[in-house]
């Protein structure tokens, strides 16, 4: 991937550990980040907004302590996956918490990322968008995302049906940013 400038020097490997439903949580994410890989989890893994608030507070404290203990260490940023589909009643409260805790990056899925981009960019965070087709990538790019995640055939979760090589090639025809 083309590494965003905000991530340079903070990662040992230019990779994002996937936000795995019911698997990824604050402990896994913190340890992943301490190993120099960007860790993520789905917002909905925290079963309530109160739990999400606690998780984000814990993550920020754990990673700040790791950076303070070894300033030379590559402690990667963490991110959160926010499902934007209309069936998710927690989009607004979760986005509020994301902004409160200034989550370094947000991965949007299953919806238009425009409002998330505005909110997250307001505090200096980055927004990446999951896409399964070049059509969706164009919409995400137009919304101002900082990166596009090509979810191709064989990916976990809400996978697309297109081959990764052809999907990336199609997106690269118009997108020069982080992919």
Set out the residue ranges of the language-model regions.
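Active-site entrance/lid segments in N-terminal catalytic domains of soluble metabolic enzymes
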Residues: 1-178
């Amino acid at each position: 991937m083309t590494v965003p400038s905000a991530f340079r020097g903070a990662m040992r490997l230019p990779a994002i550990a996937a936000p795995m439903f019911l698997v990824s949580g604050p402990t896994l994410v913190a340890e992943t980040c301490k190993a120099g890989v960007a860790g993520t989890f789905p917002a909905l893994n925290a079963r309530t907004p109160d739990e999400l608030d606690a998780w984000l507070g814990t993550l920020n404290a754990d990673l700040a302590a790791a950076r303070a203990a070894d300033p030379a260490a590559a402690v990667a940023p963490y991110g959160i996956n926010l499902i934007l589909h209309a069936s998710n009643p927690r989009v607004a409260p979760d986005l509020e918490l994301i902004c409160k805790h200034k989550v370094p990056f947000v991965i949007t899925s299953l919806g238009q990322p425009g409002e998330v981009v505005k909110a997250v960019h307001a505090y200096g965070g980055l927004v990446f968008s999951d896409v399964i087709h070049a059509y969706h990538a164009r919409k995400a790019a137009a919304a101002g995302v900082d990166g596009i995640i090509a979810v191709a055939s064989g990916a976990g979760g809400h996978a697309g049906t297109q081959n990764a090589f052809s999907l990336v090639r199609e997106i690269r025809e118009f997108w020069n940013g982080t992919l």
